């Protein structure tokens, strides 16, 4: 039987979903310009490092903490995590990219779903108390859809791997087959 809640969350992983992920490289562009990333192998090495050093321990860990805060109705913990995620991204481009993606994601999610937490998070941004990080938005949406946290994190990481790979396919350039090979190899056995 198909789990429709999972499909609804997975919709936000689609590279055609208009969050702006396709236009943010999160540092990849710099590595390409410096010829550190220039082919399939060097991109995959960069992607593994980004996934293991940045996404897993910053976004992934925060997602688990946000999920727990949602379960405990701890709004202050969510605001604290929002600020931490924003300031730990040192490059201005990365901070702005995350902010734009989070803003777009929460607006789209709020249009599609009636979630008190997403509405609250958006209101906090309007009151200048929150930035709207995509990892937090995605977690709130998954929580609203009653998807377990492990799946929420897996989908979020997949979405990032897929988007960054599509960016690399265009920027390096890599072929579409090479891009799909990389995405396939990034999925744990």
Curated annotation (Swiss-Prot):
Q: Which GO terms describe its molecular function?
A: nickel cation binding
Task: List the subcellular locations.
Answer: Cytoplasm
Give the main localization category: cytoplasm
Question: Key word NAD present in the record?
Answer: no
Give the signal peptide range: none
GO CC entries? cytoplasm
Per its UniProt record, what HAMAP family does this chain match?
UreF
What is the protein's quaternary organization?
Answer: UreD, UreF and UreG form a complex that acts as a GTP-hydrolysis-dependent molecular chaperone, activating the urease apoprotein by helping to assemble the nickel containing metallocenter of UreC. The UreE protein probably delivers the nickel.
What does the UniProt function comment say about this protein?
Required for maturation of urease via the functional incorporation of the urease nickel metallocenter.
Its family remark reads: Belongs to the UreF family.
> Which protein is depicted?
Urease accessory protein UreF
Please tell me the species this chain comes from.
Answer: Staphylococcus xylosus
Question: From which lineage does this chain's organism come?
Answer: Bacteria, Bacillati, Bacillota, Bacilli, Bacillales
Gene name in the database record: ureF
């Amino acid at each position: 039987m198909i789990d429709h809640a999972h499909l609804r969350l997975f919709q936000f992983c689609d590279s055609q979903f208009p969050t702006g992920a396709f236009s943010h490289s999160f540092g990849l562009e710099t590595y390409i310009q410096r010829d550190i990333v220039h082919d399939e192998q060097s991109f995959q090495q960069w992607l593994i490092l980004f996934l293991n050093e940045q996404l897993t321990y910053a976004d992934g860990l925060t997602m688990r903490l946000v999920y727990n805060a949602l379960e405990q109705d701890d709004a202050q913990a969510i605001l604290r995590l929002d600020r931490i995620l924003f300031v730990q991204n040192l490059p201005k481009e990365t901070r702005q990219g995350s902010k734009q993606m989070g803003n777009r994601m929460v607006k789209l999610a709020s249009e599609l779903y009636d979630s008190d937490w997403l509405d609250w998070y958006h209101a906090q941004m309007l009151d200048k108390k929150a930035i709207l990080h995509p990892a937090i938005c995605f977690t709130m949406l998954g929580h609203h859809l009653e998807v377990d946290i492990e799946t929420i994190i897996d989908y979020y990481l997949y979405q990032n791997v897929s988007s960054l790979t599509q960016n690399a396919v265009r920027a390096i350039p890599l072929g579409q087959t090479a891009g799909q090979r990389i995405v396939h190899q990034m999925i744990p056995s």
